[in-house]
Amino acid sequence: MDRLHEFDNILYDRKENTDSLINYWVDYSNPLTWQFWILIAILLVPLIILYFKIDRSKVFLIGFFGYNVHVFFTFIDIYGINRGYWHYPYQVIPALPSISLDTSLVPVAFMLIYQWTLNNQKNYYIYAIILAAIFAFILKPILVNIGLFRMYGNINYFHLFIGYIIVLLISKWITWIFHKLYKPNFSAE
């Protein structure tokens, strides 16, 4: 029973920590701050661009790829937050610290790169690595400088770059596997 009691104490501490982060959001990261509205723009503008730019003839392929980017980027981001490697002082929704990046900016950017490489017979890996470098070495430092992203411990931008590379590789490979397995069923049933 001691193990379960210890587990309950850990969860209680985690709830207290979550409550503190929500209180921080109410005080400093609410809709009355300019940071909140920057994050809203980071969330909505890429989705609007995607709506107009996505190749509708490949919408499921590109959408599936984007979903993979979203899922794996979210996994890596949650891992980094939970391990204390980084965090987002300002958030659109307090329970989802990086929703603007995880669900919009990063997936949409990689989707548009993926679409462009498909439509122009270009090497996906080269352009995706360039985009990963832009995110890790240009966008993240900007977010740090304006206070929207914080790194802790020994984490640096190269580590973030490696995270982006992992996401872009896994997402591409899973999409490729599912695309190869796809066999359309044209029966009337």
Regions picked out by a protein language model, each given a short descriptive name:
Residues 1-189:
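Aromatic-rich, lipid-facing transmembrane alpha helices and their immediate juxtamembrane interface loops
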